[in-house]
Design a protein with these regions (language model features):
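N-terminal secretory signal peptides that target proteins for export/translocation
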Residues: 1-25
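Sec-dependent N-terminal signal peptides
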Residues: 22-39
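Short coil/turn motifs at beta-sheet boundaries
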Residues: 31, 175, 207, 300-301
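Extracytoplasmic Ser/Thr/Pro-rich, glycosylation-prone low-complexity segments
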Residues: 52-283
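Extracellular/luminal regions of secreted and cell-surface proteins that mediate adhesion/ECM remodeling
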Residues: 280-320
């Protein structure tokens, strides 16, 4: 499994290269200190922050849903026929790891694998999490540290009435803009699973099911939750469904919740899309590309320390 931490910084300079040369010993030392400090310090590149109907997470993720005028467009791509089905029976156990198909950055860390949380409506990164059937407010320790929940509640499958019930996944698209689609098909409340009276009798609890997707987008690292049918037959799936994202960054737990049980509303409307957008990436605009250190070092006039700095930024210094 590939997990890659990111450590980046930003500084803006006008010149592409600068040669730092000082004649006296104190100035030589100061030149090196300044260069090293500029390269290793973390500076923030400010960019317009996307607006969100219900706010921004502590890490900087924002979300909008398709009910907003500038929100995402609901566009369902069904993968029941084309995708890989790996779960078709009721279980609280986890499955995986499965390949994402590309590197996906989430809360500042890149992942190439994911795990499924059984029939309970969540996925995790960095390790499996089982038996999390009761939804809590996000971020929730019950989901581990890094997770995406789209239909988190005590789920199950009534396969006898819904033969396509299960969890499917497929990576689609061309390199650079691929998508991982994870589809929960015909999810029901646990009490309506196979073998129960609700399932056996064909109750609305078993036949009016939930179908939704988690979509990971390559390059943009955005996340889309899509709900084809989010109004099931049971009070418990409509009211208890919880959705959001959470992860660890800079040693702290972060999370952004779209819905927790009956808050902010009892149900999610059918044919809804919810898009989570990460904050603008930090960048290394100033790079120390070469140094010149004379050997042996001395206080002589011609004993010159040199440092070449490359500007990878997009802005220029201004006089002042």
């Amino acid at each position: 499994m590939l997990i890659k931490g990111l450590n980046q910084g930003v500084l803006h300079m006008q010149e592409t290269y600068k040669e730092i040369e000082k004649k006296d010993w104190a100035a030589k030392l100061m030149a090196i200190v300044v260069v090293v400090t500029m390269v290793t310090s973390t500076f923030v590149l400010f960019a317009p922050e996307a607006s969100a109907r219900t706010g921004t997470g502590s890490f900087g993720y924002v979300f909008k849903d398709s009910a907003e005028s500038d929100g995402p467009t609901y566009a369902w791509t069904d993968i029941v026929s084309s995708g890989t089905k790996f779960l078709g029976s009721t279980t609280d156990g986890s499955q995986g790891p499965f390949d994402i198909g590309f590197d996906f950055e989430f809360y500042g860390t890149s992942y190439d694998e994911w795990y499924n949380g059984g029939d309970n409506g969540y996925i995790t990164f960095g390790g499996a999490v089982s038996n999390a059937w009761t939804p809590y407010a996000i971020p929730a320790s019950q989901l581990g540290t890094t997770a995406i929940a789209a239909g988190w509640f005590d789920g199950g499958f009534c396969v006898s009435k819904n033969p396509n019930s299960g969890v499917y996944y497929e990576t689609v698209g061309d390199a650079g803009s691929r998508q991982l689609i994870i589809q929960m098909q015909d999810q029901v409340y646990w009490s309506a699973r196979d073998g129960t009276s609700y399932c056996n009798s064909g109750s609305a609890w078993a036949t009016n099911t939930l179908t939704w997707q988690i979509i990971l987008n390559e390059g943009t690292n955005t996340i889309v939750l899509q709900y084809k049918d989010a109004t099931g037959g049971s009070y418990y799936d409509n009211e208890y469904l919880t959705a959001g994202i959470q992860g660890i960054a800079d040693g702290a737990q972060h999370g952004l919740q779209y819905k927790y049980r009956s808050t902010p509303s009892n149900t999610i409307a059918d044919e809804t899309a919810v898009k989570f957008v990460p904050p603008p990436p930090k960048r290394n605009d100033l790079k120390l590309s070469a140094t010149t250190i004379p050997q042996p070092m001395s206080l002589a006039e011609d004993n010159i320390l040199g440092a070449t700095v490359t500007n990878n930024g997009v802005n220029c210094d201004t006089a002042g």
